[in-house]
């Protein structure tokens, strides 16, 4: 059965001129492979406004699966996130100058939400194509985690039939010309996200493999 997969990517932030999350996601708009039919939307790197845009995208597309994607400069792998926490703690301002500290995303909401995606399976499928990938256990405390938590809160409260989650991606090479940081080509990032969408559409259950972090 075909599943509509909504992918979201952010606009540039923190002085960058591109955001690879949107550059990759927009390439996949209208793509179809296996059980996945993909639609793409951009969200602003702004606390709360990003959630409002996401809610409108849900109304517009009525997806079965939502995968939000964000840039994690410094990471070397495609990293599906395991958990979102109920905390805004911004080291830098967002794109409208907001810099919340020690603030709950949802007053009265749970401390954390688990992903609804088969992230270990996604990682294995991406690695089969020679693309580095690993499960991540922290999505940070900036707008990426904010959107991830807000997505799972929205799903839990209003759309229990939707499965959702978040994937962080590295810089693309053009972002590292003036700094020493790992990067991954846009082609490989795009390929990995397509694999993630198809895998999520094909499988609800995750695989049982060892993982975790020691510190």
Curated annotation (Swiss-Prot):
Entry's EC annotation: 3.4.19.3
Catalytic residues as annotated in Swiss-Prot or TrEMBL: 81, 144, 168
Molecular functions (GO terms): pyroglutamyl-peptidase activity
Source organism: Bacillus velezensis (strain DSM 23117 / BGSC 10A6 / LMG 26770 / FZB42)
Reaction(s) catalysed (UniProt annotation): Release of an N-terminal pyroglutamyl group from a polypeptide, the second amino acid generally not being Pro
Cystine connections: none
InterPro entries, per database record: Peptidase_C15, Peptidase_C15-like, Peptidase_C15-like_sf, PGP-I_bact-type, PGPEP1_Cys_AS, PGPEP1_Glu_AS
Annotated localization: Cytoplasm
CDD domains xref list: Peptidase_C15 (cd00501)
Recorded family membership: Belongs to the peptidase C15 family.
Protein name as it appears in the record: Pyrrolidone-carboxylate peptidase
Highest taxon listed in the record's lineage: Bacteria
């Amino acid at each position: 059965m075909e599943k509509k997969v909504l992918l979201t990517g952010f606009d540039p932030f923190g002085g960058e001129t591109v955001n690879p999350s949107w550059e990759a996601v927009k390439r996949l708009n209208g793509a179809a492979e296996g059980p996945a039919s993909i639609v793409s939307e951009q969200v602003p790197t702004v606390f709360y406004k990003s959630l409002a845009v996401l809610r409108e995208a849900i109304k517009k597309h009525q997806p079965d699966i939502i995968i939000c994607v964000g840039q994690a400069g410094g990471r070397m792998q495609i990293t599906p996130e395991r958990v979102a926490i109920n905390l805004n703690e911004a080291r830098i301002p967002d794109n409208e100058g907001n810099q919340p500290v020690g603030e709950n995303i949802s007053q009265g909401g749970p401390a954390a939400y688990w992903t609804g995606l088969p992230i270990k399976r996604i990682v294995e499928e991406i690695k089969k194509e020679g693309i580095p990938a690993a499960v991540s256990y922290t999505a940070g405390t900036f707008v990426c985690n904010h959107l991830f938590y807000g997505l799972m809160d929205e799903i839990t409260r209003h759309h229990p039939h939707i499965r959702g989650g978040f994937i962080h991606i590295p810089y693309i090479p053009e972002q590292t010309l003036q700094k020493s940081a790992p990067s991954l080509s846009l082609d490989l990032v795009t390929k990995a996200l397509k694999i993630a969408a198809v895998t999520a559409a094909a499988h609800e259950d995750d695989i049982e493999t060892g993982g975790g972090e020691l510190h």
